[in-house]
Amino acid sequence: MRTITCSACAMMKQALKWIALAGVTLVMAQATVSAEDKVSVLMKQGLADMAGKVVTVLTVDYAPGAVSDAHVHPGSVFAYVLEGSVVSQVEDEEPMTHTKGQSWYELPKKPHLVSKNASQTEPAKLLVFLLSQESELIKAPIK
């Protein structure tokens, strides 16, 4: 059996510290990159008086600092802030900050360039009604 000298122990301890630091840094970087929205569909209902049209009711939860990718909605969007505050920018309009109790409307097929939690420390939540064609997705990424 080989005896490890004190200098070898010190080198191993130092190497383990660097490995641990690298692991923590990687986890923190992944957490920052993956902070996105969480969409939950509550209801999807066809409209009897509008053939082929559906209303989708959903919530969008934003963790602190969360950001949605730029996207487009196929139909009309009606959004209401249930909790926190959200920054939204559609097409060439100025970014707007909407707080709890406020609502807004988005025209169909307009690029939604910014949609994010305005806070780095508090969550935010939206209630959204989307009126669209039955076959369309809730949102599509901007290419």
What are these regions (language model features)?
Residues 67-69, 87, 104, 108-117:
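Histidine-centered metal-chelating micro-motifs
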Residues 95, 110-137:
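Ligand-binding loop in jelly-roll beta-barrel domains
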Residues 47, 62, 92-109:
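Short acidic-glycine-tyrosine-enriched beta hairpin
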Residues 75-93, 102:
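Glycine- and acidic-residue-biased ligand/ion/polar-headgroup-sensing regions
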Residues 52-57, 73, 93, 109, ...:
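Extracytoplasmic
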